[in-house]
């Protein structure tokens, strides 16, 4: 559904509301039992619902040899995975069905281990041996272990922003003109998995991102009560660098 208006010869406006229900998307059918011992076959069973609203406004004018224009656009998007052939999951929160396209899944970080006593009282850590200052995760299913079955939907989509907006303006005078374009998005989750943020000082990477200079407080014994990033280490530490709420930001 759309509306297109033109007023006063200079002003234009367009509004659109759309709904898209895609079916028969080719995906891997992981519902097939693994007993077969082969890769799951692909089948046209995928289904996605998309909804959105778009609005654009424009103004143009002329005064003698001077021409100018301003165009603005804004869009709000939403999507839902109805079916994607995902295999059976032991817990409902592990299913990607019902979530947005590109929804990120990971562990929920709940702080840092304060000391060895804290580690001993916590659930079993399966990703690596942990030390004080390492990231502590929530045991979502209460089984006393931190593993892949504790991953939940975190943040928002990493692929499709909820909102897109832009501004295009320019002018022309006697054959000379300038156009300017500004674009932006919001409602998107970005993973901080670049080397100088995610794992600095490892594998020959001697740089630490300026991201740490903002409001980041590295865990140390003296700063354990106010720290918001884990201890620094040059050694491998799989626990600290799992996909989790520790390493995401709004995009």
Regions found by a protein language model. Name each.
Residues 8-10, 64, 176, 182, ...:
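Bacterial peptidoglycan biogenesis and beta-lactam-recognition machinery
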Residues 16-19, 150, 180-186:
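Active-site proximal loops enriched in glycine and acidic residues that flank catalytic Cys/His/Asp
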Residues 25, 147, 189-193:
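A short, polar/proline- and glycine-enriched secondary-structure boundary/capping micro-motif
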Residues 43-46, 62-159, 199, 209-212, ...:
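Conserved small-residue
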Residues 103, 185-251:
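Extracytoplasmic gating/loop element in the C-terminal half of outer-membrane beta-barrel translocons
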């Amino acid at each position: 559904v759309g509306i297109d208006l033109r007023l006063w010869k200079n002003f234009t406006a367009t509004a659109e509301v759309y709904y898209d229900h895609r079916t028969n998307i080719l995906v891997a059918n992981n519902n097939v039992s693994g007993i077969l011992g082969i890769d799951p076959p692909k089948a046209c069973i995928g289904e996605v619902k998309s909804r959105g609203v778009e609005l654009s406004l424009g103004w143009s004018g002329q005064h003698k040899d001077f021409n100018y224009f301003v165009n603005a656009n804004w869009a709000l998007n939403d999507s839902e995975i109805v079916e994607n052939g995902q295999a059976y999951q032991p817990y409902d929160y592990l299913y990607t069905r019902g979530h947005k396209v590109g929804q990120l899944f990971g562990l929920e970080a709940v702080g840092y281990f304060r000391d060895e006593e804290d580690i001993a009282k916590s659930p079993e850590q399966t990703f690596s041996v942990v030390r004080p200052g390492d990231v502590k995760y929530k045991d979502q299913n209460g089984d006393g272990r931190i593993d892949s079955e504790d991953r939940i939907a975190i943040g928002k989509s990493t692929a499709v922003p909820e909102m897109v907006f832009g501004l295009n303006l320019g002018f022309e005078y006697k054959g000379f003109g300038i156009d300017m374009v500004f674009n932006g998005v919001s409602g998107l989750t970005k993973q901080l998995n670049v080397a100088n943020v995610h794992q600095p000082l490892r594998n020959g990477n001697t740089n630490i991102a300026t991201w740490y200079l903002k409001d980041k407080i590295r865990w140390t014994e003296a700063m354990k009560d106010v720290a918001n990033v884990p201890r620094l280490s040059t050694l491998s530490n799989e626990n600290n660098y799992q996909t989790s709420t520790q390493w995401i930001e709004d995009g």
